[in-house]
Design a protein with these regions (language model features):
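Aromatic-rich, lipid-facing transmembrane alpha helices and their immediate juxtamembrane interface loops
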Residues: 1-281
Length: 281
């Protein structure tokens, strides 16, 4: 499809830009297969799932997500390494869900059999879909970096973010300090990526914010579908506060660093400077 489109549009500036844009969109859609499928199921079951079904809606979503995951592995749409990342996200995400629902940060209002405490198990797949997207987008766009911070600093930073998600309920919230560290660590980092014919680059911090924005949009779809709700949405649905974006940006850091545990960030050739992501630094 793309080669034919590229021939039709030609190699001029406009034709090249349109081809790159189309290729970018198709690759992004491919990277979002798991998350997009799960989100579509959440939205669809809100309106068509029978109230008197033997299997509850949440349990259906859990079994559906498992089936989709197995199909993606069987058809090699997802690699074993990406499956490892998804498993890590399940553990990290479910642990946070158990704590946050107990603290009343948000609520899953429906019944289910497959659950831990107040948390239906399909929720782990929502976190896993972020991990799946990041792992897949890194692979199909051939991500590489310049001025990437030492790996050990990113591990400590993501740990501090994760701890703060719990600790701010009991002690002072250090979120402002974490954002300062975000720009200190990643402010000079560029991510390089291939779309179709050309190599492009973007500030990595901008990438974090853009992905967080789309997660916020997906969160609005999820709450609209009553898969969960925040306290101010108990009576009727409303847009999720834009203030949640800062939490999603920080969660993006954790997600991104978890992916680097399996797929080590590579250095973009020809960018100069020392590869600061080398082991042992």
């Amino acid at each position: 499809m793309l080669p034919r489109t590229a021939r039709v549009l030609g190699t001029g500036r406009f034709g090249t830009a349109v081809t790159e844009f189309l290729a970018f969109g198709l690759k992004q859609a491919y990277a979002c297969i798991f998350g997009g499928t799960l989100l579509a199921a959440i939205l669809l079951t809100r309106f068509v799932y029978p109230d008197d079904a033997v299997l509850t809606r949440y349990d259906f979503l859990f079994l559906f997500a498992v089936a989709v995951q197995l199909c993606m592995l069987a058809t090699r749409l997802e690699s074993i390494n990406e499956a490892k990342i998804i498993l890590i996200f399940h553990v990290v995400g479910t642990a946070m869900e158990i704590f946050k629902t107990a603290a009343g940060s948000w609520v899953y209002p429906e019944e289910s059999f497959f659950r831990i405490g107040n948390v239906p198990l399909f929720t782990g797949f929502m976190y896993a879909s972020v991990g799946s997207y990041l792992a897949r987008v890194s692979r199909i766009f051939h991500f590489a970096y310049s001025r990437y911070p030492p790996l050990w600093t990113t591990y400590l930073f993501s740990l501090a973010i994760y701890v703060n998600f719990f600790a701010h309920h009991f002690v002072i919230d250090i979120r402002i300090g974490l954002f300062a560290l975000l720009f200190l660590l990643y402010g000079r980092t560029w991510v390089y990526y291939s779309v179709y014919r050309y190599r492009h680059r973007m500030p990595l911090v901008l990438g974090f914010f853009l992905v967080a924005l789309f997660i916020w949009i997906a969160e609005n779809i999820g709450t609209f579908a009553r898969a969960w709700h925040y306290p101010d949405q108990a009576e009727e649905w409303s847009l999720v506060s834009l203030s949640k974006l800062n939490a999603w940006v920080l969660l993006m850091i954790i997600s991104f660093v978890l992916v680097t545990l399996v797929n080590r960030p590579g250095k973009e050739p020809g960018t100069g400077g020392k590869d600061r992501a080398s082991p042992g630094e």
